[in-house]
């Protein structure tokens, strides 16, 4: 993961946040699919995660852990939907 990109995103660069999300979309889909199974639920989980990342990007403490942080948010959203 390119920490420079993450730092730009953390400092409010909306385009960079979008780029980071697109770079991780396959991983996000695989994780969501392993928990939810239906396309509608997967789409909802990824959409919810995207909104949260845009709102909370400034709270990421360590740029090196962006992907871990992103996937954890996604798993939490999947679990909310799965309940």
Q: How would you label these PLM feature ranges?
A:
Residues 58-61, 75-83:
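Arg/Lys-rich amphipathic alpha helix in sigma70-family domain 2
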Residues 14, 25, 39, 57-63, ...:
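A short, glycine- and basic residue-enriched loop/turn
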